[in-house]
Amino acid sequence: MKVTIAHNNYDKTLKTVAYLKEILKKKNVVFDAKYPDVVISVGGDGTLINAFHRYENQVDSVRFIGVHTGHLGFYTDWRNYDIDKMVDALLLTDEAPAKYPLLEIKLITESGETKYHLAVNESAVKRVSHTLEADVYINDELFENFRGDGLCVSTPTGSTAYSKSLGGAVIHPRLKALQMTEIASINNRVFRTLSAPIVIAPDQWITIVPNADHFVMTVDGARIDVRNAKKIEYRISHHSIQFDQFGHHHFWSRVQDAFIGENNSND
């Protein structure tokens, strides 16, 4: 087994990483940052998502483990005080990994060039200082003419992130569905949109055709300035992000822990 560690640079994280490296070396674990079997992310969700994008070209052969050292971690199963237990489980457990759907993004330019991206959580299309005007298609059939600040397309696990703050539903990852949420849509006698999140089946796709030469597309929060784009296609990828399943909390436990916490009722 070949392992690498991805981490942020906070003091608490660096102390955890130093201890983790010490334990792994004692267990004679091989470190390989180029072609790892397992990526251990120490920090928070942002650290893990950055680690995914670093190894997304190896997504079918890499598994992820998240160690949480901050205040909130949706993708992190272990705490910094669980390092010994986590390493023992890593070396002794041979369970099939838990798999979560990924978002495939296909950006097609006016010249016919195609650029591909993968997202763990979501991708959004926006304009910086102007209203976004875009035609939205589902399975190549026109669905609506959108006017507003932007549009967000998310995975099921991404439904707990930016999409949720936009009023989207929280979707279990086994559904493998896409969700599109509107960002401050304009609705009046001239412009009409659905003004509600939509959820589509895993064998369907969403196409956004912006009526602008220049706009911003985000992929898991990373900004991409886009010029001369013809359209953007979104669908559930045939790839998945894989998490080692030992100690893996089920989806609704993660949601409850992240957004509700302990029951503080005085009853």
Swiss-Prot record:
UniProt subcellular location: Cytoplasm
Cofactors, names only: a divalent metal cation
Its EC number is 2.7.1.23
Q: Which Gene3D superfamilies match?
A: Probable inorganic polyphosphate/atp-NAD kinase, domain 1, Probable inorganic polyphosphate/atp-NAD kinase, domain 2
Q: Which GO terms describe its biological process?
A: NAD metabolic process; NADP biosynthetic process
Gene Ontology cellular-component terms listed: cytoplasm
- Can you tell me which residues bind NAD(+)? 45-46, 121-122, 147, 149, 160-165, 184
The UniProt record lists the keyword Nucleotide-binding:
yes
Q: List keywords of the entry alphabetically.
A: ATP-binding, Cytoplasm, Kinase, NAD, NADP, Nucleotide-binding, Transferase
- State the active site: 45 (proton acceptor)
Question: What Pfam families would the database entry show?
Answer: NAD_kinase (PF01513), NAD_kinase_C (PF20143)
The domain of life is: Bacteria
Q: Does the keyword Methyltransferase apply?
A: no
Gene Ontology molecular functions: ATP binding; metal ion binding; NAD binding; NAD+ kinase activity
Main location per the UniProt record: cytoplasm
Reactions listed under catalytic activity: NAD(+) + ATP = ADP + NADP(+) + H(+)
Regarding protein family, the annotation reads: Belongs to the NAD kinase family.
Q: Sorted alphabetically, which NCBIfam families does this protein's record hold? A: PRK04885.1 (NF003424)
Describe its function.
Involved in the regulation of the intracellular balance of NAD and NADP, and is a key enzyme in the biosynthesis of NADP. Catalyzes specifically the phosphorylation on 2'-hydroxyl of the adenosine moiety of NAD to yield NADP.
Q: Which PANTHER family match?
A: NAD KINASE (PTHR20275:SF0)
Name by which UniProt lists this protein: NAD kinase
